[in-house]
Swiss-Prot record:
Residues 1-13 have a biased composition (Polar residues). GO terms for molecular function: DNA binding. The keyword rRNA-binding does not apply. One of its GO terms (biological process) is plasmid maintenance. The gene is repA2. Residues 1-31 are annotated as: Disordered. This protein is involved in the determination of copy number in gene replication. It binds to the repA promoter thus inhibiting the synthesis of the mRNA for the initiator protein RepA. Keywords: DNA-binding, Plasmid, Plasmid copy control, Repressor, Transcription, Transcription regulation. The keyword Repressor applies. It comes from the Bacteria. The lineage of its organism: Bacteria, Pseudomonadati, Pseudomonadota, Gammaproteobacteria, Enterobacterales. This is Replication regulatory protein repA2.
């Protein structure tokens, strides 16, 4: 069998069906992501003065960390100072 015949016969078959079921919508993906986070972490909502929020964002940018990671490090540091 020549290569051209192989190419025609191999690509002429039906495509495989999507095996994982229907893809999730963006809203469903977000909901599942939040549910996973809630299972492992606690949510903290705070209101900061704009200058402190800017400081936090600057720390995040300089260190390449998320706000959660920077706040966790700050809390750990303060807890060590207080011998907790």
């Amino acid at each position: 069998m020549s290569q051209t015949e192989n190419a025609v016969t191999s690509s002429s078959g039906a495509k495989r069906a999507y095996r994982k079921g229907n893809p999730l919508s963006d809203a469903e993906k977000q909901r599942l992501s939040v549910a996973r986070k809630r299972a492992s972490f606690k949510e903290v909502k705070v209101f900061l003065e704009p200058k402190y929020k800017a400081m936090l964002m600057q720390m995040c940018h300089e260190d390449g960390l998320t706000q959660a990671e920077v706040l966790t490090a700050l809390i750990k540091s303060e807890a060590q100072k207080r011998c907790m």
